[in-house]
Amino acid sequence: MNRIPALLAAVAVILLFAGCGGSNDAGRSSAQPAPRGHLLPRDFPGWGHEAIRPVPPGLFVVTYVGPKDRRPWVIVSDTEGVPRWWFNPDTPALWGQVLRDGSLAWARSFGDGYGLDRRMAYEVRSEDGKLLRLVRTKDSIVDGHEYRELPNGNVLLDTYVPETADLRRFGGPKRAAIVSAEVQELDRAGKVVWRWNSRGHIALGETGRWWRSVLSNPRRRLRREVFDPVHINSIEPGNHGEVIISTRHTDAVYGIDRATGAIRWKLGGLPTGQSLRVVGDPATRPLGGQHDARLDRFGRLTVFDNGKDRPRRPRVVFYRLDPAGGKAIYKGQLNDPEVSRSHCCGSARELPGGGWLVSWGDNPLVTGFDQRGRIAFRLHLPASTFRAVPTPPGATSIRRLDRGLSEMESAAGP
């Protein structure tokens, strides 16, 4: 691997940042060199960090494909904008994260929208780049939208399960090939210990306004056109035996009873008997093609709301759920004035030291917010990252990442 000295790399990054065109609320910007003792690869892509306000120290992961050479990158950065670890997978990575034991996991990506390619898997690697294992769902191809660690060491994954449905009332074929959304919980040995499928729980009618897009954008599988009426994109363990999922093609987030499989509540989308009444939200339709529904440390539901085809900017929106009272109470939102639209993708995660980290989907921008909801930094990337994911507290350190980089460099040779 060709490398250049960190000082020259810093100069290169500064020049690349100058072409980003981003505003600077505090009137200052910074672009950071490689970690001490390391050389940035010569082909390291453009990287512009805009420092605006102080932010607690922390680490996070971004992934993207270089726009010029199409080379995939998994990068761990600190909140000061210094790349601390990087890796070039053999296939593009949809998104990545540091796991609680310090290993890194990312979803392979083959540009198919969801899991259609049998090579699909989550790669789990050590900090020195060694492949530890591949993780896949059972009975159908794993999808790349979710890999959620649980406290007991199990993981929640999603898969898109093929089936047949009559879509004539929506303008589709009589015997259409579709995919339903399935959640699987796998133990450490890869055994499925719990699963749930949207079949019989999310009606095809809930796809609503998305049917035109779904029917006009099928995927091909086994020489057939396959339609995706649900499109699950996140899974989150909830409270009181609940699992929370986000499904883009229904504009909704659902709370699922693990014991019965029944839907306890629904937020957004077309109204059903489980729908929550939204209180106080300035948006008349609360969600639009949303992603990354999570519970924060205060128990609030947080959602990256793309606002797809809605008359508003993308936002991170907060709700206090009251299923017993049948309502969801709006608790605020975050925006970045540099982002006016978001067709897909995106994430919103709490920073361990306080504040929020937001990937704006198909925009090449990550924004850090402080605890008061003010923009603390922007990371301008050469291409979009599906998610930006903070590392769990205590999972790894700059020293460990530095050691892993050193071992990879030694193995690669001069």
Task: Set out the residue ranges of the language-model regions.
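Bacterial N-terminal signal peptides that target proteins for export
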Residues: 1-8
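C-terminal motif of bacterial Sec signal peptides marking the signal peptidase cleavage site
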Residues: 16-19
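Bacterial signal peptide processing site
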Residues: 21-23
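Histidine-/acidic-rich catalytic cores in large beta-rich domains
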Residues: 26-414
